[in-house]
Design a protein with these regions (language model features):
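A short Gly-Trp-Pro
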Residues: 1-12, 18-183
Length: 183
């Protein structure tokens, strides 16, 4: 990993009105094929002018960071939260200005999952694909990274190590007033 990846980078929406500041190396770079990510991706892509969320194979490419290392420095008032169900602890934040999917926030967790398209280069190579048992029928996955049918022990171990480094805290994401949307 290059030194720049351990520094501070900015992640922004397509039009640049929403900007996140990200410090430090990512926890993991993964693609998810769960039914929730696929459904959320379809919903976000239906918004006017929205950039693609789902890859051609139906996966969602994510770069996961510690929640205490990501903050919104501009445009937080433009973020809208999409929840697949009203009671869901998982929300996907979308920049309403250009309908760019920004990140997924599991509100009970200690990490933020940034959509790969929002993270500037260089990004570490894809480390794994998870939840591949839910991929679309007929999709053949390349063997360039491990393909796990569910969440892998390796994925969970990386999250646990990050949580331990945070003193087992699960902070709230600060710097954004995200209004829930029901679409």
């Amino acid at each position: 990993m290059s030194p720049k990846q351990h520094g501070t980078v900015t992640a922004s929406c397509r039009c640049g009105a929403v900007v996140l500041e990200v410090t430090g190396a990512p926890i993991v770079h993964a693609a998810c094929y769960c039914t929730s990510c696929q459904e959320a991706g379809r919903r976000i892509e239906q918004r006017p002018g929205a950039p693609s969320v789902l890859d051609a194979d139906g996966g969602t490419d994510f770069v996961v960071y510690r929640k205490d290392r990501v903050r919104c420095v501009r445009g937080g008032e433009r973020l809208e939260a999409l929840r697949l169900k009203p009671e869901s602890p998982t929300r996907r934040l979308v920049a309403a200005c250009c309908n760019s999917a920004m990140f997924l926030d599991f509100t009970k967790g200690h990490w933020l999952t940034l959509y790969r398209a929002r993270v500037p280069e260089p990004v570490p190579p894809l480390e794994m694909r998870v939840m591949t048992a839910n991929r679309r029928e007929g999709v053949m996955l390349p063997q360039d990274a491990p393909n796990y049918p569910a969440h892998s022990g390796r994925f969970m171990w990386k999250l646990l190590l990050a949580w331990a480094a945070m003193g087992f805290r699960a902070p709230k994401f600060e710097g954004a007033q995200a209004y829930d949307i029901r679409r």
